[in-house]
From Swiss-Prot:
GO cellular component: late endosome membrane; midbody
Main location group: membrane
GO biological process terms on file: midbody abscission
Source organism superkingdom: Eukaryota
Protein name: MIT domain-containing protein 1
Domain MIT: 8-86
Organism in which the protein naturally occurs: Mus musculus (Mouse)
Function text: Required for efficient abscission at the end of cytokinesis, together with components of the ESCRT-III complex.
Keywords annotated in UniProt: Cell cycle, Cell division, Endosome, Membrane, Transport
Record's subcellular location: Late endosome membrane; Midbody; Membrane
Topology versus the membrane: Peripheral membrane protein
Pfam families in the cross-refs: MIT, MIT_C
Keyword Cell division carried by entry: yes
Family annotation (SMART domains): MIT
Length: 249
């Protein structure tokens, strides 16, 4: 466990808090999140070590850092093997009216600089708010550390008057992405039902409601209108897998 023997300064206190969370997540077998906290906490301890001059405290810090590094390395090896075997599975349950589940909060753990290609299967990228959801998702993809160059979208076509809105909206998104050096390939299917997002680094995310899991904002000037972390959600389940050999649509 992370103990307060590291010292009482603010940097040490922050490191202890992060590492305490890492140990808790580790005990709950939430290894992916635990690894992130271990790595963050270790970096913080290394900064504390640099600013520590007393030899006895430096010795304590080195010992603790070594222990946390060993545990983090073991978790990383375990997760790598799970991914290699195709056994990795994490489930997140989003409760009714829950907040804090913006696309960035949900996906950032899996968006590394190795991500250059993304596949999205979602039958409901049709109505105006759904097009905005897709646009927000694309905005997230072109931010660092990602280096996305191609996005594949498979969705269902809107029949009737809504078809013009859907096609023109997607075309506008396509042109906008193009100005950022990103190609958007759009395909339609009348039989699509599954909702799935895949990255070419092997991560696969299945959301029960697809990208459309946010509730309608109470008004244009209400919290959550722009910041999706503050927007209440519909109840849904998110399943996360890792497949070394990601299939293309």
């Amino acid at each position: 466990m992370a103990k307060s023997s590291l010292g009482q300064d603010s940097d040490s206190t922050a490191a202890v808090a992060v590492l305490k969370r890492a140990v808790e997540l580790d005990a709950e077998s939430r290894y992916q999140q635990a690894l992130v906290c271990y790595q963050e906490g270790i970096d913080m301890l290394l900064q504390v070590l640099k600013g520590t001059k007393e030899s006895s405290k430096r010795c304590v810090l080195r010992t603790k850092i070594s222990g946390y590094m060993d545990r983090a390395e073991n978790i990383k090896k375990y997760l790598d093997q799970e991914k290699e075997d195709g056994k990795y599975h994490k489930q997140i349950k989003i409760e009714e009216n829950a907040t804090g589940f913006s696309y960035e909060s949900l996906f950032r753990e899996y968006l590394h600089e190795t991500v250059t290609e993304v596949w999205i299967e979602d039958p409901y990228i049709r109505q105006t708010h759904q097009l905005y959801n897709f646009l927000r998702f694309c905005e997230m993809l072109i931010k660092k550390p990602c280096k996305v160059r191609t996005i594949h979208l498979l969705t269902s076509g809107y029949e009737g008057l809504g078809n013009t809105q859907q096609s023109s909206g997607l075309e506008e998104i396509k042109q906008s992405l193009g100005s950022h050096g990103v190609v958007l390939e759009i395909n339609y299917s009348s039989s699509i039902h599954d909702r799935e997002i895949r990255f070419n680094n092997g991560w696969m995310i299945k959301i029960g409601r697809g990208l459309d899991y946010f509730k309608k904002p109470q008004g244009r000037f209400s919290l959550g209108y722009y910041d999706l972390d503050l927007r209440p959600c519909h109840e849904t389940t998110v399943d996360i897998f890792h497949n070394k050999h990601t299939k293309k649509i």
